[in-house]
Design a protein with these regions (language model features):
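Active-site proximal loop and beta-alpha junction motif in alpha/beta enzyme cores
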Residues: 2-99, 106-246
């Protein structure tokens, strides 16, 4: 038996057009239609407009039952910068992001394979207008399919070194850097949690969330050119186990 769907979307109160993709297993849900064009004179203003007026769309797409705890996605929209092929506003279960590497790769792949941007066999340059700035990418297309995407991120820099906060009575040192968002980078050798592995992830996650809260209360940050003034992520780094045996 051959089943053929005949869906009249006008019957529904709302309908979103999305394409689900992944980048090496990292999920990225691309929203390509069904939402109003965001208002704003910059991509950051567009992001804030969506956050204020249509955040229920983000939560509906990112949280269960349609999403999951580690869900990522993006709204594709008109760009502000005329150099760009399209605008992009990244999102996850926690809110909106100024930049996301794996979602950039996913967005370019979807845009090409869904016919949202013109493409040809071989190397294609696709430029995205994101809240963090222009993201330039190169996509290799073979037989109409995207084989690979490389990207050049926005300018990255170290913002503040030798910063400290006190968490549960212990002073923790870290560096704040920018790479599309502000990151707090923490050397794990100063901690008592141990090497980074599956067993220690819950402890690092709990500490990271505590640090994120305290950092944004105690340490002001401001991008020199963009309206970005919060630390969005805490990242832990440490020695590679058994690196001499690799």
């Amino acid at each position: 038996m051959e089943l053929k769907a005949n869906v009249n979307f006008d019957r529904f109160e709302a309908a979103l057009q999305v394409v689900d993709a992944h980048t090496e297993g990292e999920f990225c849900r691309m929203v390509i239609g069904g939402f109003p064009e965001p208002e704003g004179n910059t991509m950051i203003e567009k992001k804030k407009w969506m956050e204020k007026n249509y955040d229920n769309v983000r939560t509906a797409l990112m949280f269960e039952p349609r999403g999951h705890h580690d869900m990522f996605g993006a709204f594709l929209c008109e760009p502000i910068n005329k150099e760009a092929d399209f605008g992009v506003m990244f999102m996850d279960t926690g809110g909106y992001l100024n930049m996301c590497g794996h979602c950039t790769i996913g967005a370019v792949t979807v845009a090409i394979e869904a016919g949202l941007v013109e493409s040809h066999e071989g190397e294609n340059e696709v430029v995205l207008d994101a809240p963090a700035g222009l993201i330039r990418t190169k996509a290799i297309v073979k037989d109409g399919k995207v084989e690979s995407v490389t990207l050049t991120n926005v300018p990255a820099f170290v913002y503040k070194e030798n910063q400290t906060v006190t968490i549960d009575g212990k002073e923790i040192k870290f560096t704040i850097s920018f790479g599309g968002s502000f990151f707090a980078l923490v050397d794990t050798t100063q901690l008592d949690i141990g090497e980074i592995n599956a067993k220690s992830v819950p402890a690092y996650t709990a500490l990271g969330m505590k640090m994120l809260d305290v950092i944004n209360k105690e340490i002001p940050v401001k991008h020199p050119e963009l309206d970005i003034d919060t630390v969005d992520l805490v990242e832990f780094y440490g020695p590679t186990p058994n690196k001499d045996k690799a």
